[in-house]
Structures are given as C-alpha cells and as structure tokens.
A protein has these predicted regions:
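Conserved beta-strand scaffold positions in the cores of enzyme catalytic domains, especially
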Residues: 156, 199-201, 320-322
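N-terminal secretory targeting modules
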Residues: 2, 20-157, 161-180, 361-370
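Conserved beta-strand termini and adjacent loop/short-helix elements that scaffold enzyme active sites
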Residues: 41, 202-204, 294, 323-324
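Bacterial N-terminal signal peptides
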Residues: 8-15
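A structural signal for isolated positions on well-ordered beta-strands in alpha/beta enzyme cores
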Residues: 118, 155, 200, 290-292
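Alpha-helical cap/lid subdomain in secreted, periplasmic
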Residues: 224-369
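Bacterial N-terminal signal peptides that target proteins for export
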Residues: 1-7
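Conserved SGNH/GDSL esterase-like catalytic core that processes O-acyl groups on lipids
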Residues: 57, 124-129, 167, 173-268, ...
Length: 370
C-alpha cells in the first residue's frame, strides 16, 4: 500500500512539474521594442525591432498584464534612468539605475499583483553619456495598448540647465557626475508636471547659440544639433513626421555658454544663428507655433541680444523673457559646478510657468511646483 502511494505521489509530482514548466514556457512572451502599443516620447530611431535614442529625457510607457516585466537593451556608454510603476512621473522615481553594456537584461518590475500595470522609463542623462537601444520586452502576460498621450505637450531646447546637470548635488563645488544629472528635476520637467503635459528635451551641456562653453568645438552649436535624431551623431536628420506628437509651445533656454568665461559674442553673429534656430522650429511646426525665448541670468546683455534677434527675425508668436541674477541664490540653490539644483530649478520654473500659461491659455492652478 505504502509503495503504491509513493508511486502515485511521484507520478503526481512529475505531472505537476511538467504542467508548471509548460505554463511557465507558455507565459514567457517576448515583444519587440518597436511594437506600436508601446508609447515613446522624444526623438527616437526605429530600426526593425529596435528603438534607439540618446537625447535627455526620452521616455516610454509600457502597459502589460501580469507580475513581471524585463527589458533586453544595449548602451554605448553609461546611461542612467528613472523608473515609475503604476504612477505618473514625479520628482522621486521608484527606481534609479544605470545601464552600461550591450545585450543586457534589466528587470523593470516583478512581484506585481494580478491585473494590468504600467511602467514609465525615462533617460535621465544626456547624449554624451551614451546611446541607448531597447531590443525587446519580456512579460508573463500580454502587452497592452499604452494609455495614450496627454493633451498637452511642451518642447524644450537648451543646454546643461535643461539637461539637469548637477540637479541632485547640493554643493556648487562638486564636479560633474553622471549619477547626479537628472533632467526630471529641471525647470522643464517641473513646468510640464505642473501643466500635466508630455515633454521632450533637445539639450546638450556646454552648447550655445553661436559660441559653446570656453569656445569648445567652434562653428557647431545648438542650431546645428537641433536638426538631428541623435544628439551625438549627424548621421540621421530628424523630421517632425517621425514623431506622433506636435508641441503646443516650444521653449528655448540658451545663451549662457555664449557669454561664458568672460567672453561676449558678436551680436550680429548671435542674432543670425538665433534666427536660424527660430526658423527651424517654425519650419518643423508651422508659423503659428508659439516660442518662448528665455534669456539667461549670466549677464544683463543676454536679454538685449535675444530680444533684438526676435525683433529682427520678422517671425510672429515670439515671447522673450529675462531671467535675472536674483532668480535664485548662489548657495543652497546650486548643485554641481554652479548649476541650479532641484531647489534652484523650482524657482526658475515658477518664473517660466506664468508665461507658458499666458501663451497657451492653460489655466494656472493653486498647487505646488514640483
């Protein structure tokens, strides 16, 4: 009798083991990164199953059923990311991690409850830190259609301030470190969250309108990079039909580096290149696209340069604003290398938000800037 029971239990165990293995194999689903149900925001290049990008702040939303989500990916250097599960983007991510190798498997979520879930993954570092490629996603349930884009969208064009250089540092004497660069804590992200808007960033540290920081790489400035799909490569030219969105307003925050290291650019050259950038934006999105032009607090001359360039352009729907030196303090509001930290960026955002409200007609609500 005992022998029969043992044989029965052994057979039952084998059946259960085989059944569980079959179920496990059945529910492991691999989906290409280019699947249309996954929603990317920012400049990307789709190549077969792969999706690649390097600009700051590019993010995707992926909705799925089941407890598990993993990503097969590659990185050319060391990109850092913010991740949120089952919530909107906020100042504090659920998870922060770095990818620094090719053909890497990253578990984005596991142990989730039954039902539908959504993960948002945002690239928090800029193009100099690497190009990122998503190959595919692994789930134990179905990939579902992402929730859809927000009704509002803002595009920001800028330099290290827009990239989030040093935002997580609390000492202005700290050097640059990739792990303290976080575009999600910039004025751009704060303003976008305030209005409940999607956003994309076209930004690169050290870039100017006609002169980069300390004259680095003369003759190649932000008006040139703006035409590119990848920040760090001129190989692919970007066109607006490559994106499934059109911004409601474009914000340009450039000129700090033009006046860097106690130098002043020739105003005629500056105006010519600024107008070139304005015309590129208008060519992409139409003459009716409103553009908010922010003058840096680096020098009082920056506002005169930008205002004069806008007036010379002959273009409509341009607003120019000066951010003066008193917009934040130079102790607690600064992070690495004298760049605004999160606290400083909140103050910048609080000055920019009213102008965006006026330009777009979006009402300002009684809620904190965060």
């Amino acid at each position: 009798m005992c022998k029969k029971i043992c044989i029965f239990m052994a057979v039952l165990g084998l059946v259960l083991s085989t059944d569980l293995s079959a179920r496990k194999a059945k529910v492991s689903i691999e989906t290409p990164a280019s699947d249309s149900r996954i929603e990317y925001t920012g400049r990307i290049l789709v190549n077969g199953d792969d999706v690649s990008y390097d600009w700051s702040g590019v993010y995707f939303r992926i909705k799925f059923s089941g407890p598990y989500l993993a990503m097969k990916c590659s990185d050319t250097k060391n990109c850092w990311f913010n991740l949120w599960t089952d919530k909107e983007m906020s100042p504090k991510a659920d998870k922060v991690f770095m990818v620094g190798a090719a053909d890497t498997l990253v578990v984005l979520a596991e142990g989730l409850g039954k039902g539908e879930h959504e993960v948002i993954l945002q690239k928090r570092t800029e193009g100099e830190q690497g190009r990122f490629t998503v190959h595919s996603f692994i789930t134990e349930g179905d990939i579902l259609q992402a929730q859809g884009r927000k009704e509002r969208h803002i595009e920001f064009i800028g330099d290290s301030y827009t990239c989030g250089y040093g935002t997580e540092s609390h000492d202005k004497n700290d050097p640059f470190m990739a792990e303290t660069e976080n575009c999600n804590l910039t004025y751009a992200a704060i303003a976008s969250r305030y209005f409940g808007a999607d956003f994309n960033l076209i930004s690169h540290s050290g870039q100017g309108i006609c002169r980069n920081y300390d004259d680095f790489r003369p003759g190649y400035n932000m008006p040139d990079r703006y035409s590119l799909t990848f920040d760090e490569s001129p190989e692919h030219i970007w066109t607006p039909d490559m994106a499934p969105y059109r911004p409601d307003v474009v914000v340009i925050y450039l000129c700090t580096n033009d006046f860097s290291t106690a130098r002043q650019p020739h105003e005629t050259i500056f105006a010519g290149r600024y107008i070139e950038l304005l015309k590129k934006v208008k060519a992409y999105y139409g003459d009716d696209m409103p553009i908010l032009c922010l003058a840096s607090n680096v020098t009082p001359f920056s506002f005169d340069y930008i205002r004069n360039a806008c007036m010379m352009s002959g273009l409509s729907n341009l607003t120019y604003v000066a951010l003066t030196s008193g917009i934040h303090n130079y102790e607690d509001d600064l992070g690495a290398s004298w760049h605004p930290n999160y606290r400083g960026h909140i103050k910048v955002a609080s000055s920019v938000i009213p102008y965006i409200s006026t330009i777009t007609g979006w009402e300002m609500e009684e809620k904190p800037y965060r």
